[in-house]
């Protein structure tokens, strides 16, 4: 018996020992792996604003009033801008066109057909002033809405932001060219199909070999909540971020991480509102849900600036998404910070 059992014990001991070694190695590697993921995905440059918000400056107060005026015109006077209310889609495009022309821009429309109707993307361009004028910084926002929703936050707030950024830069050429583009057909049933306005635009840009060095999708930037528990996230982002919805979010896919870092560093250097950023795989829910996705498909670096919409806003895609729900003071702080981002991105390298 003894001579039989000893070899069995000798065979078992090494296996047990190596199993323990493997477990110890795994236990040491996992924290390192989580640290690397945190450094690559969650850690952002600069210091986010914290504490009590300072009073708006006179310029920010004027910006606040203008933002509210645009949102009330689009989501109040015009209202729902979906396939079911096609005349309102046309009216919204005309409103955007009129504002841009009043700022001195030449407006270009990119028309396309979808579901037997004509839709258009509306574009204004601020030509660059240096040798890098062929390089483009593009600011985009969709002006349509979901059905049965007036779309104050989603996305009259984003349209208002881009219109006011166009005002800021109207007489201030940068080294790189800056484009302000307003997309049709971001919402269902168009998302995510070839009939999205941004898909038409991004594919045409690639066909022309446009050198878009940065695309910023301004998507739902008007709603904030300082109550604990007001903010949710998709997994695994819920493991790394706070549950108070008082911040503006900036997200990208992994390929656009360098642009994300540059943008959020510039934003934090100026803005008086908290920020959080994430460079996450495109499969994470919410990360790709807007027009920046169209530019990713064409190989362009693109990020989304958002209040996180359905992960915070209780009136998302409902008839209650009305102008009275938004915080125009905080929205003005966001747009003011974005102006600083654009200046940094559009300067000569």
Each language-model region and where it sits:
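N-terminal Sec-pathway targeting helices
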Residues: 11-33
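N-terminal capping segment at the start of a domain
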Residues: 40-88, 103, 144, 314-321
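Extracytoplasmic/secreted proteins, especially bacterial periplasmic and envelope-associated proteins
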Residues: 66-69, 73, 87, 91-102, ...
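Structural recognition of the beta-strand scaffold that forms the well-ordered cores
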Residues: 123, 137-140, 179-182, 213-218, ...
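Proline/glycine-enriched tight loop/beta-turn segments at coil->beta junctions
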Residues: 129-136
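Acidic/histidine-rich catalytic neighborhood of metal-dependent amide-processing enzymes
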Residues: 146-255, 284-287
């Amino acid at each position: 018996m003894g001579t039989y059992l000893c070899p069995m014990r000798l065979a078992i001991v090494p296996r047990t020992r190596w199993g323990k070694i493997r477990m110890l190695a795994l236990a040491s590697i996992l924290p390192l792996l989580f640290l690397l993921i945190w450094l690559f995905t969650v850690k952002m440059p600069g210091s986010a604003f914290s504490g009590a918000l300072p009073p708006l400056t006179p310029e920010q107060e004027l910006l606040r009033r203008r933002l509210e005026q645009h949102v009330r015109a689009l989501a109040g006077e015009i209202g729902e801008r979906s396939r079911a209310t096609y005349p309102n889609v046309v009216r919204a495009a005309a409103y955007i066109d009129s504002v841009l022309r009043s700022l001195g821009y030449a407006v270009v429309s990119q028309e396309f057909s979808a579901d037997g109707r004509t839709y258009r993307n509306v574009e204004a361009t601020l030509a660059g002033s240096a040798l890098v004028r062929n390089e483009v910084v593009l600011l985009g926002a969709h002006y349509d809405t979901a059905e049965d929703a007036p779309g104050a936050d989603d996305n009259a707030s984003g349209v208002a932001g881009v219109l006011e950024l166009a005002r800021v830069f109207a007489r201030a050429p940068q080294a790189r060219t800056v484009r302000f583009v307003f997309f049709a057909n971001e919402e269902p049933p168009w998302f995510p199909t070839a009939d999205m306005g941004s898909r038409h635009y991004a594919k045409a840009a690639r066909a022309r070999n446009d050198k878009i060095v940065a695309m910023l999708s301004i998507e739902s930037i008007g709603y904030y909540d300082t109550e604990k528990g007001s903010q949710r996230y998709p997994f695994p982002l819920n493991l790394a971020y706070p549950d108070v919805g008082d911040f503006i979010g900036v997200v990208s896919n992994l390929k656009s991480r360098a642009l994300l870092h540059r943008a959020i560093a510039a934003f934090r250097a100026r803005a008086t509102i908290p920020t959080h950023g994430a460079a996450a795989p495109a499969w994470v829910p919410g990360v790709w849900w807007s027009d920046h996705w169209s530019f990713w498909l064409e190989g362009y670096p693109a990020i989304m600036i958002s209040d996180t919409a359905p992960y915070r806003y209780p009136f998302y895609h409902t008839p209650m998404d009305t102008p009275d729900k938004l915080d125009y003071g905080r929205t003005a702080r966001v747009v003011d910070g974005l102006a600083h981002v654009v200046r940094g991105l559009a300067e000569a390298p």
